Design a protein with these regions (language model features):
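A short, N-terminal "cap"/entry segment at the start of jelly-roll beta-barrel domains
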Residues: 1-39, 83-85, 128-153
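Short, contiguous, helix-prone interaction/anchoring segments in small proteins
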Residues: 30-45, 112, 116
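Active-site region of the double-stranded beta-helix
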Residues: 31-38, 49-61
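Short acidic-glycine-tyrosine-enriched beta hairpin
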Residues: 36, 77-106
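His/acidic/aromatic-lined binding-pocket segments of jelly-roll/cupin-type domains
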Residues: 45, 54-57, 61-66, 84-85, ...
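Glycine- and acidic-residue-biased ligand/ion/polar-headgroup-sensing regions
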Residues: 49, 58-78
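Histidine-centered metal-chelating micro-motifs
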Residues: 51-54, 72-73, 91-103, 120-122
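A short hydrophobic beta-strand segment most commonly corresponding to one strand
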Residues: 94, 107-124
Length: 153
């Protein structure tokens, strides 16, 4: 049996120090790793059944892996058209992240690993229902949150 690496983090089960995301309901998250110099963020989100997060738009590629349940995604394109996708446990995808979308869990919820990459400090924008930017989220925001993770619990 190999020794655990210092960055090994379990992602399922009750032992996880999940956190709610601000005042949003229906999902919690755990930041796994932040590399400010490379502008990389790895995290896991756990959605309650049939819940969604908020509209947002990424500034770079996003890799996702459905660990448990389903990942439901509704993309909103520039022409206003919407495309709904359902990803099931074990599905891995890489997207450009360049269009607005909202995502959540399926009828039994969902636990999804995300890996964000960017060529700038800006990782994603939180959008309102009209897709206007409400807040810009940076790699440093993630770093600060991870650095203070145990202090907040």
């Amino acid at each position: 049996m190999s020794a655990a690496l210092p960055f090994d983090v379990p992602v399922t089960g009750q032992e996880i120090a999940w956190k709610p995301f601000a005042n949003y309901q229906g999902f919690v998250y755990k930041i796994l790793n932040v590399d400010v110099a490379r502008r990389n963020v790895d995290m896991v989100l756990r959605f309650e059944p049939d819940s969604v997060c908020f509209y947002h738009r990424h500034w770079g590629p996003v890799a996702s892996l459905v660990l448990e349940g389903e990942h439901h995604l509704q993309e909103v394109h520039a022409d206003g058209s919407k495309v709904t996708k359902v990803r099931r446990q074990g599905e891995y995808t890489v997207s450009t992240g360049n269009h607005a979308h909202i995502e959540g869990g399926g009828p039994h919820g969902g636990t999804i690993f995300f890996s964000f990459r960017s060529d700038q400090d800006h990782i994603y924008d939180i959008l309102d229902d009209k897709l206007a930017v409400v807040h810009e989220v940076t790699v440093q925001d993630f770093r600060d949150s991870l650095d203070n993770w145990s202090l907040d619990n």
